[in-house]
Amino acid sequence: MKLKTGAGAAFIGVMASATLAAADEEPKYGGTLTYMIPADAPPSFDGHREATYATVHSAAPYYSVLIRVNPDNPGSASDFVCDLCTAMPQPTDDGKTYTFKIRDGVKFHDGSLLTAYDVAASWNKIINPPEGVTSARQSFYIMVDKIETPDPLTVVFRLKFPTSAFLPALADPFTWIYKKETLDKDPHWYEKNILGSGPFKFVEYQAGHSIKGERNKDYHHKGLPYLDAITGIYADKQAVRVEAIRSDRAAIEFRSLPPSAVDELVGALGDKVTVQTSDWNCALIVTPNHKRKPFNDARVRRALTLAMDRWHGAPALSKIAIVHTVGGIVFPGSPLAATKEELEQIAGYWPDAEKSRVEARRLLKEAGADGLSFELLNRSVDQPFKYLGIWLVDEWSKIGVKVTQRVLPTGPWFEGLRNGSFDVAIEGNCQSVINPVLDVSKYQPHSVFTEQYGNFDDPHDIDLYQSMLNETDPAKQRALMRQFEKYVLEEQTHEIMTLWWYRIVPHRSYVKGWKIGPSHFLNQDLATVWLDK
């Protein structure tokens, strides 16, 4: 049953019917959900530090957040609900003050009470991390002036300027609430340990194998969770994960599988498997290390993007990998995204691939980089890292560039990115809630965005971004986004976009209560999941 054919269209109709039927069913309590995590291990357990699904899928069920996207409507960019707060507040002070009341009686898993002081301490670690502590999304919150706690059950966020980007940023799923007492003693403690107030209590972690949790009987959302226990199994090989679902040793992988693997499962299991699909706020990018020659030369960086024929590559790759759409730096189809006509004006997106490659060869010669060879740092994850890596090596060979790959497990790969030990790297810009202005903040220098690995300084880049962030007129903001996009992708080629992803999640049909969203980071606390068996 092919997802791209008429049969696939019928298949999607079946999926919709199944979802509607599930909504009318009474949830059942009990059972253990076993799910696959497509990684060898998370780089750490600290959600504030990390930017990978390996951390979220491992530890999100053990934590609470202040607010979140509605788990019944995870595709929304504006439907936010309280987790630890009692009600979504209306902003005051001309949109610059948000006051949250915190639920009374919430407990951490060690039995201690969670208060506004814990919420404020966690958010201060995210927004203003102490020296030596990494905060992956610190730049998302540059609009925040200060956080106040007038009493144990009240948290007040005061902004420097009003912006519609604030609430979506506050709903980021990595913003777990930690215990203030623990953070005061050691802000690095949560990198290797788990202690939260989420729907499940942490039980056991076996490095490279599994992570287990049990139902939190004191969970602050009455009646949840439904499951008795959860077990996440680590496996970086796709074949292992597919076979686990086929043989019912696992029920689901929350990230995504490619069409070929989904077809295999549907063919083998029929109505015993259900498939959910969604556009995906995620794309792999190619990051040149500006501190290594010749990648300090914009002409060389531009040659690499000109070599890539995205328009013909996307249809072919979408048959075997979880990629789908040609796009710029903004989530395709969203109001601030470039149209196809606008994209075609940017180097690397020209309709004529041969014209692009002629220009690429000219630039390499002009820069004295004829016969260029380099090493590409890649991640040891099949989808879509390895597939994109093979494609990139082939594309670059068409302009006479020779590339070898250094493929590393998730932890060492992240370490290589962070310490700059690479020529060029494949990495990702994968966000959660669709929030275009903040989603593109990654394309600023490391001094502003800590998870920027290109090692460049560029005040003009920062100025362009700040102008866009502070602009409240939608049309003017869109025009500024086009300027920023062309500057990042062509004029300086600080980053090189590959393709945007498409999320396809097959799961055992007895798994109910989970809905797919535009990000593999969303809806992962598993509180509403139940098993119909």
Residue locations for each model-derived region?
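Aromatic- and charge-enriched surface segment that lines or borders ligand/interaction sites
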Residues: 87-132, 156, 241-244, 294-297, ...
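Alpha-helical secondary-structure segments
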Residues: 34, 115-122, 152-158, 198-199, ...
